[in-house]
A protein has these predicted regions:
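NAD(P)-binding Rossmann-fold cofactor-contacting core
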Residues: 110-127
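Conserved N-terminal Rossmann-fold NAD(P)-binding element of oxidoreductases
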Residues: 87-90
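Hydrophobic/small residue at the entry helix of a nucleotide-binding pocket
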Residues: 94
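C-terminal catalytic/substrate-binding lobe primarily of soluble NAD(P)-dependent oxidoreductases
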Residues: 248-565
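Short linear motifs in low-complexity or flexible loops
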Residues: 8, 12, 20, 31, ...
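Rossmann-fold cofactor-recognition segment
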Residues: 130-142
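A short, basic/flexible loop-to-alpha-helix module at the beginning of a structural domain
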Residues: 68-83
Length: 565
């Protein structure tokens, strides 16, 4: 290859494999030599080496499948240094998966890490205590939050909140006032069931909680330390999958000349500048699903009076038994039954006076049509807000419909049926599947629909075998959450004064560069799927299903009701 990238020679087919394997080895050795130079500081050297080696590895793998050379983890792992303290609040399954990954990517003395949990698991804690991590048996409550936290973190430290039912406004406010970096995976309350029985449906939503956060933040005089909220797998990674999908859709549409003239020029410009809201609008995106199918199975079937899941049972029950919630697109012609609109804020969402676990929609993951539940999730708020286009007067010109479509593992589905029979009172025994899992995967991604290519899915297909190779005794579901937590922590360490941020405010390429090695098969693929592609004709002509055949992207076409049998 010459100076201007022109081809100056031809490699014979006989030597093709040998030459490219040796060339790859040469590039890797060159990168090691270059970035061990003392003229480059350690952190920059490691991150530049990571970027170059990851690029080379991916480039060769895509073009020459025979040229697979395993790179040592310490060579290709992006890493940051953190000299302050880290506090884990909660040490459930996600935290247990997060800690070993965190120590691969964040250089910190284990003695600077403290774990707080009110139900210690000695077997899970022992190896970390032996390495110098401190464990404290305690519980963060409304009457002790400040007293507990100030013992373990102060200005410049990092608090990773992986507990449940800690009021987000209170703990974010405390961290803001004390200069502490903060991360969580969901916006929660002290007691989500308090007053829930008689509350208006809109007051049970994440939208309502986010409006409370906005009111609190508006009173601050400075944005303060970085606090990244709702950065797990979903919400979290799903926002970055959505951005990547939009870029890939734009590339494919431009290459295939689906747009022309000034519109094509605008799309190319928005793609270049990552102006995602205008890009989605110009592409014609109507609907975005966070579509997930969990196929993990185990040798220990669910028993009577037992709730089995691959992640937090209490968390699933809490979000599944409250209102279904979704971002509401400007293309929608009518509200669904039991729908309520919000009266304050951007009014970008609606909720249903119907449990999310009992609200079913058709969706798609590669290569399955699934029946998913519209469980309340933070991405329905954050993605909708990020992709909204407003005029100078603040009126919304464009907004897609966004919601979760969750098909959990078989054991969880059986647990939900039993939960309904118990009038939503949680079973006396709960279990999160780990070592007993024998097969399956967690398939999680953004299904972006309504553009000229019909549908596009971007996300992770992570098998139980792959997740165990990365962190033993964990499952695919917790792995996707854990690596997202670590990536966000690294971004916070490098950007410590950004105030409150949602996943959509973080650079998607930064997060995905770190996360991809932990996500199994990273897929970005087009599909011709629509909710009307394959519809049942049972009782055709006698039940008159409420669908809109002229516009497949209306919510009524996704919603599964009794009249669609």
């Amino acid at each position: 290859v010459g100076e201007n990238n022109e081809c100056t020679g031809v490699i014979s087919r006989r030597h093709h494999k040998e030459v490219f394997i040796n060339l790859k080895r040469l590039f890797i050795q060159f990168s090691i030599h270059l970035f061990t130079s003392k003229s480059i500081n350690t952190a920059d050297r490691r991150n530049q080496r990571y970027t170059l080696c990851s690029f080379l590895n991916q480039w060769f793998h895509e073009r020459y499948t025979f040229a697979r050379i395993a790179l040592p983890q310490e060579l290709v792992s992006r890493m940051v240094t953190f000299d302050n303290k880290i506090l884990f609040v909660g040490f459930g399954f996600v935290a247990r998966c997060t800690l070993p990954i965190l120590l691969k990517h964040i250089k910190i003395d284990p003695s600077n890490i403290t774990i707080i949990d009110f139900e210690p698991d000695e077997e899970a804690l022992r190896p970390w205590i032996e390495r110098g991590v401190t464990f404290v048996q305690d519980k963060v409550c409304p009457d002790n939050l400040g007293n507990v936290l100030q013992r373990y973190v102060g200005e410049g430290d990092l608090l990773i909140d992986l507990a449940w039912n800690i009021d987000c406004c209170e703990i974010v406010s405390w961290c803001h006032d004390h200069g502490v970096l903060y991360l969580n995976t969901s916006v929660e309350l002290w007691d989500p069931y308090e007053h829930a029985k008689n509350a208006h449906p809109t007051q049970l939503t994440l939208y309502w909680r986010h409006m409370n956060l906005r009111r609190m933040i508006s009173q601050w005089t400075e944005q303060g330390p970085t606090a990244v909220l709702e950065h797990g797998a979903n919400p979290g990674l799903i926002s970055h999958f959505t951005k990547q999908a939009l870029l890939d859709i734009a590339d494919a549409c431009l290459e295939e000349e689906k747009f022309s003239g000034q519109q094509a020029e605008r799309i190319a410009q928005y793609r270049k500048t990552h102006t995602f809201n205008y890009l989605a609008k110009e592409l014609g995106v109507k609907v975005i699903h966070c579509s997930e199918r969990d196929t993990q199975i185990s040798t220990s079937p669910k028993e009577v009076d037992e709730f089995v899941n691959t992640w937090s049972v209490e968390g699933f029950r809490e979000e599944g038994t409250t209102t279904a919630e979704m971002g509401w697109g400007t293309h929608e012609n009518e509200l669904p039954p039991f729908a309520y609109e919000h009266e304050d804020g951007p009014k970008s969402q609606i909720c249903l006076a119907r449990m999310g676990m009992n609200t079913y929609v058709s969706s798609w993951v590669p290569d399955y049509t699934i029946t998913g539940m519209v469980v309340r999730h933070g991405e329905a708020f954050s993605i909708t807000e990020k992709l909204s286009v407003r005029d100078n007067a603040g009126e919304t010109m464009y907004r897609p419909t966004v919601h979760y479509a969750y098909c959990p593992c078989d054991a969880a589905i059986a647990s939900l049926w039993e939960l309904r029979g118990y009038n939503y009172e949680l079973q006396p025994r709960t279990r999160i599947m780990t070592d007993e899992i024998t097969d399956g995967a967690d398939i999680l991604g953004a299904l972006v629909m309504g553009h000229p290519l019909t549908s596009w899915w971007c996300g992770s297909d992570l098998s139980i075998e792959e997740s165990r190779q990365l962190v033993p005794h964990q499952n695919a579901t917790t792995m996707q959450v854990a690596i997202s937590v670590v990536a966000a922590c690294m971004w916070m360490i490098e950007n410590p004064q950004e105030g409150v941020r949602l996943p959509d405010d973080l650079p998607h390429d930064y997060v995905l560069d770190i996360a991809k090695p932990y996500l199994g098969k990273f897929i970005s693929v087009r599909s011709d799927w629509t909710p009307l592609k394959k519809t049942s004709v049972t009782f055709h002509g006698h039940n008159n299903p409420d669908i809109d055949p002229d516009d497949p992207w209306q919510f009524k076409n996704f919603l599964q009701t009794e009249d669609k049998d």
